[in-house]
């Protein structure tokens, strides 16, 4: 029963919006039932990424104006955590951020990578240094070590190596990538809010921010 209660996280992303981080915070409120352990938001302002991650509920961390002001930009992604893998600590709170030669990116991930330990051992053998104990960082290292040139191709290559049930929102300077496992086990929906595109774990989050549902 405990495993069932702890199998869900919530992810939310928006691109091309004037107040992206405020929209994400509101969306995460609607997804709070999916994870009460921690919450985080990363934004992109056209020049650099900004991140705020904290233990506890969305309301306790993102209802303060100064926090949202510290997350400027037209794109943002967020995460509420209820861990299935990895210890309960700030280093495992998402979104996780990484910087490559091809640019930086932030990842918000829901799900479990069933072959994560096998991949982690192989990556460590090849020289990767892990900073967290979450499955998400395994994906980041697979992206970093991919021989493909573009970030999109690196992610495609990385996800071909993972097994399990997952949904991902990846924010890059060029745009936002959203994907699900091949069987679509973990939920992810797409919506629009004016000119903005939104991805979320559940349609209730689209409803709360006033977005129109587009597809699953």
Language-model segment annotations:
Residues 1-216:
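Conserved short alpha-helical segments that host acidic/polar catalytic motifs at enzyme active sites
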